[in-house]
Amino acid sequence: MVLGWRNEMSKDVIKIANCSGYYGDKLSAAKDMVDGGPIDVLTGDYLAELTMTILFNQKMQRGEDKGYVGTFLKQVKDVAQSCKEKNIKIVTNAGGLNPSSMAMEIEKILKELSINLKVAYIDGDDLMPRISELNNEGELFNNMDKNIPLVDSGCQTLTANAYLGAWGIKEALDKGADIVVCPRVTDAAVVIGPAAWKFGWERTDYDALAGALAAGHIIECGCQATGGNYSFFKEVPSFDNVGYPIAEIEEDGSFTITKHPGTGGLVSIGTVTAQLLYEISSPAYLNPDVIGHFDTLSIEQESDDRVFVSGCRGSSPPPTHKACINLAGGYRNGMDLVLTGLDIEEKAEAFTNALFNSVGGKEQFDDVSINLHRTDKENPNSNEEAMATLSIVVKSMNPDLVGRLFSAKIIELSLANYPGFFSGGGGKKPGPVIVYWPALVDSKYIKEYVHLDGETTEIIPTSQMGFKDNFYQKNLVEIAPAPKGETQKSPLGTLYGARSGDKGGCANLGV
């Protein structure tokens, strides 16, 4: 990865803006991006891994026609007329578990507003109806972290969705769609697809696709690319009205990351690099359309709030698609207890023993977590400095074991145990435990479809089209020996920034 400074040059680009990094992001962001300056495509990512479970519960509680991100409909109302006038395309994964229903709702809104825009939707990601069939074909959905087959999880499967790629989006745009409603697609697909449409890229234009993959990866999480959640936050001039990111992508896959003028935040080599490291496990970033080699990138500061990224090499995509599976992992309950003064550990032990003796022992629970957080100080200057927290959490597939009775047993000890008892929150009723189960499925079983104007088109995964594999071979880099001499201690965070990324219950850290 090369860092530097670049003079701004004018080139033919497609300007792809982001207006959402998660379900619950700033509602006015779509209108802000459409009205704030010239863009060609408005995109939004709403689907964190566990969001699929939220949408599943929505379908269960409100009907089978639900299961999509309803707030996106408000955003469509806000921007549809302007997008029509400015010829701005909209591509989003807000379709969630029900892209067809969302497309129908959007068409109703457009009809009410007398706005003529073509709406396409994509499906084929839902693997739930096919799990048994795929098991019989040898697809075991082994957990990518634990290598355990799904059938051995001991949990009920709630949702199972393959991460689709970008070619369905390109197909929809090629056929004249103005709004493309996607289900579970890769976060970067909503950027790769429009770029491939703009420049007419072929399936094997791996370097260009890898560049768009990097661009999509950088802007998919909204303001994390423009100064939000940034380790060196003191560099950010203002956090008032932080601008959402825009990727200006060129025909060769090079791109510039920027934001609308007059907005807060910051676009710098640091903010872009931090987001590049987000949620990746290695420099070779796998995607169903291409493998992007992020260690080949060159990153240059073009001007204030403009960062140019180029040189990303690409390889043939893997023969598998990743699947996002969510399981019902039982129920949990717990409470935080505050301990003050002397003998903190003895107080925690006395309470823990009394509690589990009163409920019949720890063994009846599937999991028990007991943590004593020693935030107290030896010679405190205030009551707050004298406090420690005892956190007790229990989990069981049986909701009765971790229900209100467990909470009541904690409260029953309030006058019969350590001195100064009071709770810091939690308890009452049990909450569901959702287990994220990342897995792979052979791409030959992926059946993706684009629906527009009453016609349906099947999209074949690139890895199943018979192309010759093309893998980038990286030259080995010599690592200079560590410098020697006098040293001084300094906090790691003064020299290195970090960006954490989570996939359900799993997390990694890029430094």
Kindly give the residue locations of the regions a language model identified.
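N-terminal amphipathic/basic leader segments beginning at the initiator methionine
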Residues: 4-5, 9-32
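Conserved phosphate/anionic-ligand binding catalytic regions in large, soluble enzymes, centered on
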Residues: 93-98, 177-194, 498-510
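Short, Gly/Pro- and small/polar-rich lid/capping loops
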Residues: 279, 283-305, 466-496
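Catalytic or ion-translocation cores adjacent to nucleophile or general acid/base/metal-coordination motifs
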Residues: 111-127, 192-233, 237
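Gly-rich Lys/Arg/Thr-decorated short loops/hinges at beta-loop-alpha junctions or inter-strand turns
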Residues: 10-13, 49-65, 84, 126-155
